[in-house]
Amino acid sequence: MDALRAMWKGTISFGLVTIPVKLYAATESKDLRFNLLHEPCQTPVQYRKYCPTCEREVESGEIVKGYEFDRGRYVTLRDEDFESIPLAARRTLEIVAFVRLEEIDPIYFDKTYYLEPGEGGAKAYGLLRHAMEVTGRVAIARVVLRAKESLAALRVFREGVLAMETMHFPDEVRPVAALTGIAQPELRPQEIEMATGLIESLTMPFSPERFENTYREALLELIQAKIAGAPPAEPGPAPEQGRVVDLMEALRASIRAAEAQRAAGGATGGAAGADGTPPAPVARSPEAPARRAIPGLPGDPAASVPGVPAAPVPRAPGVTGAPTPGTPPAAVPGVPATAVPGTPGAPVPTAPGVPSAPAPGTSPTSVPGVQTAPNGAAPPGPFAGSDRAAEVGPDETAPGGP
């Protein structure tokens, strides 16, 4: 593991106690970077600092920062101007309050850092950490990083490490009043019950390791294939858009699909075991509420929504066990189906998105106005605006380019 490099050194001011600390970035971007090339010769394009008035390139020493206070009029500021601003917190994390973490809306959080005690600060660092653990509080502080003052929240992270989250000031958070499309529609009790049931069926302990950057992996595979000279892969078929049906049926189908997904390996389609068996679903958290019976699904004695047939829950491919009473077993690829006495031997119809034939007289369902998006697009990344080659993300266009 590569050693971390401290990006800031200072002190935590805790009353009359000062704690020397070092600051490290806690996260790093894994975005792939792409150079912009001149296609005929495959040479990286350069961006030069050019003054259109003087009609020449300018050196770095000739460049200053300017604030446009009127159209075309600037006031310039130099490094010594920024240094002259009286900020007591320039090299100090000044703790000004302690609050409970749940009182802070996550929208205020910006970037995360690790704090490590500096020379001679281990005991005071440990004392602050222990006191915060005992009281269940996080510290609110002021800090200046890169000539910008920020609010910050200090909290106990893990393995005895204090983490610092820089925070936005209130005037940096846009008001929700600017959103005009938020409505309060009337909801039927059955719809609420089905929606909460879908949430419960997808509830599991949070485990970051379950979630992978599938877009980045696919992009790396594409790059490796092009390096090896492999022909480009044919694009897959676009997902079919089912006809718009009742919201209740769409929710019911979503619950069936979620249950099948959990049985098949969870949120990310977990890898099979060494013997080829599918992974076991993640156990529910002890704090998670027990699932309630959902109208129209097995386990609820009440009748389903009038006019909407309730299909039995499908079994996930490769998962064995007794079928739901009164329903035929799901077809497993390569395994002959065993007929249940008194029932036909046809496979159980499944929800849209679960491979199987649809039930007679039904069509794939979708929620009005909701479209399925492909796996997340690569987030745009910054590019270097200097006289070296620009680096941009896959969907970015460099400003001021040729």
Swiss-Prot record:
Which GO molecular function annotation, any one, does this entry have?
double-stranded DNA binding
The Ku domain extends over 12-185
List the residue ranges of the region (Disordered): 261-402
Q: Which residues form a coiled coil?
A: none
Q: Where is the composition biased (Pro residues)?
A: 344-358
UniProt entry tagged with the keyword DNA damage: yes
> Could you tell me the keywords of this UniProt record?
DNA damage, DNA recombination, DNA repair, DNA-binding
Q: Name one Pfam family in it.
A: Ku
One record GO biological process? double-strand break repair via nonhomologous end joining
Q: Which family does it belong to?
A: Belongs to the prokaryotic Ku family.
Q: Which HAMAP family match?
A: Prokaryotic_Ku
Q: What is this protein called?
A: Non-homologous end joining protein Ku
